[in-house]
Amino acid sequence: MLFYLGTYTQRGGAGVLGCELGAENAMRVIGSVFLKDPTYVIANARRDRLFCVCEAPAEGEEGGSAASFSLGENGAPVLLSRQNAVGRGPCHLCLSPDERFLYLANYVSGSVS
């Protein structure tokens, strides 16, 4: 079984991790992408794209950010893009039903972007 985690890098985490749960429930990291403080992570329905919010801003911006990833053959995340959240403190995200839009809830600014 594959699953994905966002980890606080300022506390020693590696960023976004792709993991596999194997025999005897042993967890194995299959890939990682360093982004500063990624938190909430979701995949699309086909599980070929992954999205996360980061408490840290994209370069040269204020507030948080969102990132998108493709998932390689083994499920490892590969960074596609990172954008400003247009809000502060992004904490949750969801895809529109047709998966054309990504919505972010911003805790600090109290906004949706």
Describe each region flagged by the PLM.
Residues R28-F34, V78-N84:
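A short beta-strand motif characteristic of beta-propeller blades
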